[in-house]
């Protein structure tokens, strides 16, 4: 389950940034995880809840946006939705398809609370 190592990395990154900013608690974390990134969002949420225990992120709400996969044909230039890494262009049937969206994985933002909030 690689989601646990990903969850631990997220916790490390957000806690370090929150401390740098003088935060005492993280209330929300917004992630962008493309549907082709190979990460199961529900597993990540489960692992995150375990990884965040006893940290500034222990009560953080994990919001995950999942952009669809998009491919672009290297022959005719058509862009189209893809669900797998290997796709055929629906227009010209070429297999020269480049994935242009759906592999993203990043921490978009987080909400840090300061003392007294």
From Swiss-Prot:
GO terms for molecular function: nickel cation binding; zinc ion binding. Zn(2+) binds at residues 73, 76, 89, 92. PROSITE patterns: HYPA (PS01249). Keywords: Metal-binding, Nickel, Zinc. GO terms for biological process: protein maturation; protein modification process. InterPro entries: Hydgase_Ni_incorp_HypA/HybF_CS, HypA/HybF. The keyword Ligase does not apply. It comes from the Bacteria. Ni(2+) binds at residue 2. Involved in the maturation of [NiFe] hydrogenases. Required for nickel insertion into the metal center of the hydrogenase. PANTHER family: HYDROGENASE MATURATION FACTOR HYPA. Belongs to the HypA/HybF family. This is Hydrogenase maturation factor HypA. It comes from Pelodictyon phaeoclathratiforme (strain DSM 5477 / BU-1).
């Amino acid at each position: 389950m690689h989601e646990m190592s990903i969850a631990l990395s997220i916790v490390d990154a957000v806690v370090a940034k929150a401390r740098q900013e003088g935060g005492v608690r993280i209330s929300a974390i917004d992630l962008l995880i493309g549907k082709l990134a190979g990460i199961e969002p529900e597993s990540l949420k489960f692992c995150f809840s375990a990884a965040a225990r006893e940290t500034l992120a222990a009560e953080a709400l994990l919001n995950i946006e999942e952009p669809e996969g998009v491919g672009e044909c290297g022959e005719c230039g058509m862009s189209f939705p893809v669900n797998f890494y290997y796709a055929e262009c629906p227009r010209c049937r070429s297999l020269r398809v480049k994935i242009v969206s759906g592999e993203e994985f990043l921490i978009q933002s987080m909400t840090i609370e300061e003392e007294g909030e």
